[in-house]
């Protein structure tokens, strides 16, 4: 970008600039570009003080260059330029600068840097703006540690990101896949840390329980979003609609994430069971200390464990309602306080003749046994609660 309408140095008079301008204009009109006329006394002094003049010119050019780029710089604000034209007797629309003593490479670098910033701000992918809303959309009305209830609305990014009527955007599906994989990775890390021999017992405020809650909540939002996409695809009455919409891989990723969450739930139950066993041995060894309760012990109290187990049951029920939505189920009462277990009426993998040795057969058996896994986990939680009740009675 060239810098125009600038005096190179305050020592140059308007008369010298006007003379150079007239000489250059005459050369252009005649069509012959002659050698520039001899420099005046002021111009000779400029070349003697070239470093100082170059710095002044760069400073002035940078200032005017930034001003002329403003949107408010128009003909109405060009009062200073009009007065300068009257003083010099020429038009400032012509190129009348002495380019020999100006370092244009620095101006070019500055212009490229500014254009690079503008291009960087314009090239932001608009699809990525939903990342923050997707992960924190529901967090606005849920405080940390607050649990779900049946009336809590589940918001999805469909209100911020438009989903095509016939097919989901590849960027949208990629974003959901990345978030599901992130949930699975964090869940695996939490499970590994909890299974460490020196890990602290899980409490309501521990990082393991927080990851179980946050991971389940994020997974539920993703499942609800995918359900919207699948419902729109199936409404077209096309047999290839769902298979071609690109959600098959995402569905498997979601199921893998659900398995990791179940692994974390089981690890929490195992850690609580280990703490209960230790407390039971301590109670047996010190029978004289019957008056002490778990609340006064350094280890977490039974109330802490009870709240954690109740949260796990709540999260399992939440996953049940999302995973088995629209599937014909047969309710059956289990041993845990009359909680209804959702048992699928479809045949399992063995009845379908699937090969459990293959990855597809194993995956099919895992999918058909999801409700059974949830049922067994509820039974484990119920047994732990019974052990805690017995321990408090000792």
Curated annotation (Swiss-Prot):
Main location, first listed in the record: nucleus
Record key words, sorted: Nucleus, Transcription, Transcription regulation
Cellular component per GO, a single term: nucleus
Keyword Transport among UniProt keywords: no
Subcellular location(s) of the protein: Nucleus
Stimuli inducing this protein: Expression is induced when NaNO(3) is used as sole nitrogen source.
Traits of the deletion mutant: Nearly abolishes the transcription of FMAN_15221 to FMAN_15223 under PKS8-inducing condition.
Protein purpose: Transcription factor; part of the gene cluster that mediates the biosynthesis of fusamarins, isocoumarin derivatives that show moderate cytotoxicity with IC(50) values between 1 and 50 uM. Positively regulates the expression of the fumsamarins cluster genes.
Protein name, UniProt field: Transcription factor
């Amino acid at each position: 970008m060239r810098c125009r309408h600038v005096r190179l140095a305050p020592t140059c008079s308007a008369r010298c600039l006007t003379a150079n301008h007239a000489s250059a204009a005459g050369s252009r009109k005649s069509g012959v570009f002659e050698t520039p006329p001899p420099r005046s006394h002021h111009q000779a002094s400029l070349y003697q003080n070239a470093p100082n003049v170059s710095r002044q010119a760069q400073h002035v050019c940078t200032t005017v260059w930034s001003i002329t780029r403003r949107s408010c710089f128009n003909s109405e604000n060009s009062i200073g330029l009009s007065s300068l034209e009257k003083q010099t007797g020429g038009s400032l629309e012509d190129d009348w600068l002495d380019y020999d003593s100006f370092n244009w490479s620095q101006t070019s670098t500055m212009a490229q840097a500014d254009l690079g910033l503008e291009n960087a701000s314009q090239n932001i992918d608009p699809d990525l703006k939903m990342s923050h809303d997707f992960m924190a959309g529901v967090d606005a009305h849920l405080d940390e540690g607050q649990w779900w209830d049946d009336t809590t609305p589940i918001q999805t990014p469909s209100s911020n990101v438009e989903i095509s009527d016939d097919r989901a955007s590849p960027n949208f599906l990629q974003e959901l896949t990345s978030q599901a994989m992130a949930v699975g990775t964090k869940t695996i890390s939490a499970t590994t840390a909890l299974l460490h021999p020196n890990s602290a017992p899980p409490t309501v405020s521990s990082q393991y329980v927080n990851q179980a809650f946050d991971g389940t909540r994020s997974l539920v939002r993703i499942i609800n979003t995918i359900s919207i996409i699948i419902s729109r695809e199936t409404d077209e009455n096309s047999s290839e609609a769902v298979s071609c919409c690109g959600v098959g891989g995402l569905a498997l990723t979601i199921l893998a994430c659900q398995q990791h969450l179940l692994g974390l739930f089981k690890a929490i139950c195992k850690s609580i069971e280990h703490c209960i066993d230790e407390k039971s041995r301590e109670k047996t060894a010190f029978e004289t200390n019957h008056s002490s309760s778990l609340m006064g012990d350094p280890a977490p109290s039974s109330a802490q464990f009870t709240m954690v187990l109740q949260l796990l049951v709540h999260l399992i029920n939440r996953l049940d309602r999302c995973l088995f939505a629209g599937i014909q189920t047969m309710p059956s009462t289990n041993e845990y306080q009359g909680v209804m277990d959702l048992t699928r009426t479809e045949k399992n993998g063995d009845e379908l003749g699937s090969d459990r040795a293959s990855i597809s057969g194993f995956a099919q058996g895992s999918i058909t046994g999801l409700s059974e896994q949830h049922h067994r986990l509820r039974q484990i939680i119920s047994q732990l609660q019974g052990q805690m009740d017995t321990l408090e009675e000792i």
